[in-house]
A protein has these predicted regions:
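Short, polar N-cap/turn motifs at the start of nucleic acid-interacting alpha helices
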Residues: 190-196, 267-268, 288-307, 314
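DNA/chromatin major-groove-contacting recognition/catalytic segments
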Residues: 209-214, 218, 222-223, 310-328
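Basic/aromatic-enriched alpha-helical hairpins
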Residues: 26-99, 118
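N-terminal DNA-binding recognition helix of tyrosine site-specific recombinases/integrases
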Residues: 70, 82-84, 98-129, 179
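Basic, Lys/Arg- and aromatic-enriched nucleic-acid-binding interface segment
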Residues: 132-181
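Short, basic (Lys/Arg/His-rich) helix/loop patches that form interaction surfaces
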Residues: 158-161, 254-295
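Catalytic-site neighborhood detector that most strongly recognizes the C-terminal catalytic loop/helix
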Residues: 143, 201-205, 297-322
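Active-site/catalytic core of tyrosine-dependent DNA strand-transfer enzymes
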Residues: 213-267
């Protein structure tokens, strides 16, 4: 007689808090709800990032914080360090895609999370991120020519249409030397004074000053009664709530730009980055020196600016790159 033994192993999850109602149901079932030996990821990681100080650049810290906030929106406050698994990361990656986040941005989040988890645990986190995209893919052309900008500018729209706001934002970004959408969203009225618009880039903290042009003032004047923010995108002073609003508005903005392109008969793909890249390209064609373009964009390294201009088939790029290399 042959005896067969079957063993069942049960893992009991005891609630550490309430399951996140916004998380996919199957993920809630995977999250150990109480794990005293495993601290909560978000609050622990924030402490770790704040302790890094000058050991990492400001832009790197911002990347870490942005990725952590994004993961918190997906998985909630109660996610513990030990809860992060391949299953969760793959589901998070799919969620990012569903939110309209580009593959390169998703990859940036994943690389940041991998680095933070490695610093928190002291362990090799490479296996944990196996199968999750952490590379850098070549992006499609982001810049458009001056004729496309003029066509968008001349499009007939109702003054109170949401698309009119989207167009104003696109044009303002172009007029303000490629001002990023996130910085327009958080721009406050007190940052505009004595004919200057002054802001610090959210991504790097770089201070940028732009001379206020009449076309910029015209756009600003349309939203005078909307509150402390220059544009009617954010409606709270709470940092986390404002960030969540920003993400929602970013998704709206990208969708609105696609509608604007359709109405204007524009074949190029318009995104939140298009105006910024288009300004850089126009400045380059106007023979503005590369260091000046870099300063206007808030790039500390002109090499970063070259990535904006790489799509231009122009021998001057090669010469500019040689000059940059010879500087160091």
């Amino acid at each position: 007689m042959i005896k067969i033994s079957i063993h069942f192993y049960f893992r009991v999850n005891i609630t550490h808090g309430r399951p996140n109602p916004h998380l996919n149901p199957h993920l809630n079932s995977h999250l150990p709800q109480q794990r005293p030996s495993s601290p909560r990821l978000y609050e622990t990681a924030l402490q770790k990032v704040s302790q890094m100080g000058d050991a990492v650049s400001r832009s790197t810290r911002e990347n870490y914080l942005t990725a952590l906030r994004s993961l918190r929106r997906f998985a909630g406050e109660n996610l513990c360090v030990g809860d992060v698994s391949q299953t969760l990361l793959h589901s998070y990656e799919r969620w990012l895609t569903g939110q309209g986040i580009s593959r390169n941005t998703s990859s940036c989040y994943m690389r940041s999370l991998r680095a933070v988890l490695g610093k928190l645990t002291g362990a090799d986190t490479e296996p944990l991120f196996k199968g999750v995209y952490t590379g850098r893919c070549t992006t499609e052309k982001r810049a458009v020519g001056e004729e496309t900008v003029r066509r968008l500018k001349g499009l007939k729209l109702s003054a109170h249409s949401p698309l009119a706001l989207a167009r104003d934002l696109f044009l303002f970004s172009f007029y303000a030397q490629g001002m990023p959408f996130v910085d327009m969203a958080f721009l406050r009225r007190q940052q505009i004074a004595r004919g200057q618009l002054v802001y610090h880039r959210h991504k790097t903290g770089t201070r940028i000053s732009v001379a206020l042009q009449p076309c910029m003032q015209t756009i600003i004047s349309r939203y005078q009664a909307e509150g402390d923010y220059v544009f009617p995108l954010l409606h709270t002073a709470d940092a986390q709530a404002a960030y969540n609003e920003y993400l929602t508005q970013l998704n709206w903005y990208n969708r609105a730009l696609k509608k604007l392109a359709q109405q204007a008969g524009i074949k190029e793909n318009l995104t939140s980055y298009t105006a910024r890249h288009s300004w850089a390209t126009a400045a380059y064609h106007a023979n503005v020196e590369l260091p000046v373009i870099s300063k206007a964009l808030g790039h500390s390294n002109p090499q970063t600016t070259l990535t904006y201009l790489r799509e231009i088939d122009d021998h001057r790029l090669e010469a500019a790159n040689r000059r940059i290399i010879n500087m160091v």
